[in-house]
Amino acid sequence: MDMKNMREYMSWLYYQYLLITGIYVLEPWEQSIFNTVLFTMVAMVIYTSYVFVPIHVRLALEFFCELVGGQPESTVALMT
């Protein structure tokens, strides 16, 4: 894909973003505030997922392992 097609594609994606969110009717300063708030919220969701999802997955795995009769990690560590 050459640079002209890539630029046109990115321009088309940005146009779709403007239409889907409805911010094409806003003034430029309102668009920048909206984009800042949206970017901040997306960044917070990504950061929170990065920090807390692994913890919850580990706890869920421990819970389900105990349900099916597996030994907890502390018991296995003591036996060796």
From Swiss-Prot:
Keywords: Endoplasmic reticulum, Lipid metabolism, Membrane, Sphingolipid metabolism, Transmembrane, Transmembrane helix
Keyword Endoplasmic reticulum: yes
Major subcellular location class: endoplasmic reticulum
BP-aspect Gene Ontology terms: ceramide biosynthetic process; endoplasmic reticulum organization; sphingolipid biosynthetic process
Lumenal side: 30-36
Domain of life: Eukaryota
UniProt topology in membrane: Multi-pass membrane protein
Compartmental location: Endoplasmic reticulum membrane
Pathway: Lipid metabolism; sphingolipid metabolism
Cytoplasmic topological intervals: 1-11, 58-80
Record flagged with keyword DNA damage: no
Coiled coil location: none
Membrane-spanning parts: 12-29, 37-57
GO CC annotation terms, alphabetical: endoplasmic reticulum membrane; serine palmitoyltransferase complex
InterPro entries: Ser_palmitoyltrfase_ssu-like (IPR024512)
Family, as annotated: Belongs to the SPTSS family. SPTSSB subfamily.
Function: Component of the serine palmitoyltransferase multisubunit enzyme (SPT) that catalyzes the initial and rate-limiting step in sphingolipid biosynthesis by condensing L-serine and activated acyl-CoA (most commonly palmitoyl-CoA) to form long-chain bases. The SPT complex is composed of SPTLC1, SPTLC2 or SPTLC3 and SPTSSA or SPTSSB. Within this complex, the heterodimer consisting of SPTLC1 and SPTLC2/SPTLC3 forms the catalytic core. Within the SPT complex, SPTSSB stimulates the catalytic activity and plays a role in substrate specificity.
Subunit structure: Component of the serine palmitoyltransferase (SPT) complex, which is composed of SPTLC1, SPTLC2 or SPTLC3 and SPTSSA or SPTSSB. The heterodimer consisting of SPTLC1 and SPTLC2/SPTLC3 forms the catalytic core of the enzyme, while SPTSSA or SPTSSB subunits determine substrate specificity. SPT also interacts with ORMDL proteins, especially ORMDL3, which negatively regulate SPT activity in the presence of ceramides.
UniProt-recorded name of the protein: Serine palmitoyltransferase small subunit B
UniProt organism field: Danio rerio (Zebrafish)
